[in-house]
């Protein structure tokens, strides 16, 4: 073994020691109904000092030790964002120690193996000098580790050929806990790499992310969704290549997901479809995705978590389709009219902001909903007196009414006529009067 390799080996053991110590003291809680111990999974991944040192330890074994140590750091670090029983026992100081250790190892590796590292990154189409020093080891490992993680996730997936209870059969083959751990490791690997480098790794990353989305476990699906959210924010559409339609189909298939990951599937789907279809507002994918979401919302209109998540993330899709939104008014506005009078202020504020967006995009032309919308806004303005967000709600209502006045003119004035003398709406009249003056001046 060369001197640089020997030095790196010593550093690896040195970095591993405090993590091993913290891990041994941590109280690992094994989730009920599973025989997977994460501590037992982690301990063999951490190298230990041999006494005496093995004379046969070579560069290949060192590389394997680095890979395993990275797996351990990935799992420990990714636990910081998890509330799952399998990972929630990991203390924050242990995760932080793993973060710091991997950073130190990455920098040392980049110096000791700069030539090898340069070659490996070049094979992936990356410019060595443009990749941050602390990311080079991670990227070099990805062609090796991502297929391993993909296979681990797939081990407990549903076998479509089985006639028995599919989930039970899949779990009987391999405990799902191993796949959950692999999904968290995978998401950690993906989210460490940003634009412009992630696009070069699409062919490595996307198959594993799709495998996670295809799993029956919501926890694993969720990690796949978080990975695709990061991908959509850090790659160009062209870099997704022929995977585009496959990913979009997977998004649509997952819109039926449960409440615990609904917010993730909405954010992922909106980001992916707007990233890939932004130049085609009449794309069938926009239409399919919006209709799938609306179908689920129509079945559960009172589900606060679902409507809030959808209202919070949907605007980029609205912007992407523009005037084509007119074709969806018959499904969107009945939901909006119901949500405008929801008990929670968050829903009310979000739906008002989306109504404002839709009016700006479509000028609400050729629609039967103008009169109903004005009536609902007038009612909401009065209801707001009993809400905590009184001022914010009323300001949004006034802004929307002004927009309606500007785009519908005489039609709006005719509809507003029945509300003009309502003393509870008197404070709105001056704002609408200013709009009328502006229209005349124009």
Label each region the model flagged:
Residues 1-57:
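N-terminal alpha-helical scaffolding segments that mark the starts
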Residues 3-6, 25-33, 85-93, 133, ...:
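Short coil/turn segments at helix-helix junctions and helix-capping linkers
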Residues 4-20, 58-70, 134-149, 161-164, ...:
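Core helices of alpha-solenoid repeat scaffolds
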Residues 32-53, 99-102, 107-126, 172-190, ...:
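HEAT-repeat alpha-solenoid elements in large eukaryotic scaffold proteins
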Residues 149, 154-158, 178, 251, ...:
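Extended helix-rich, non-globular scaffold segments
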